[in-house]
């Protein structure tokens, strides 16, 4: 494995929430794979913790990762055995996390859980869902068109944009690219190169790494909280 310390994940999340509340950042952005194998009870527990962050005056923005929706491996483990448990659909995800980006969105995509949110008067978030059941690890054609319209609107409004995706915009490693880089990332890279996008934030690869597209845009990949440093 990649060194995930699952036995301590609850303690890690509690410490993370406490640190976020203490440091009071302008926002908390979570780019997906939020739960333990997509289990509903894991989603519900996290939403309660994120509510504490929101109640401290810190806006929270979430996206689903590839392990968060319609999970066939959602389970509860006890001793040497396990029991299958419920996962969540895309609609249920949006309902559970409605207060963390969806309710206040400037625009929501009709074909995915993508949305645009305002961080300030001149800075927006493009939260791009690349984990639909119709196109896993890819941007849907309709979603790409929607994103193009949102970026054009941001430019017209004099706003810069931070893009966010779960999977990566570029290959961060020669060993880890297939299944990690968005399958049609080239279309996104071309779009972002002519848009007011400052950078892309991603995860998925469980590596802490920064890399640039051919146009000079940074893709900043953040490792998993449950992976040992």
Q: Which role fits each region the language model picked out?
A:
Residues 24, 59, 124-126, 134-218:
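His/acidic metal-ligating clusters that form di-metal
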Residues 42, 46-54, 178-189, 215-226:
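Short, electropositive alpha-helical surface patch
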Residues 28, 33, 46, 65, ...:
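Divalent metal-coordination and catalytic microenvironments
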Residues 45-145:
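Extended active-site neighborhood of metal-dependent phosphoesterases/phosphodiesterases
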Residues 34-35, 66-69, 131, 168, ...:
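Catalytic metal-binding/acid-base residues of hydrolase active sites
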Residues 1-40:
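N-terminal active-site segment of His-dependent metallophosphoesterases
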Residues 13-17, 43-47, 93-94, 144, ...:
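Extracytoplasmic/secreted envelope proteins and their assembly/folding machinery
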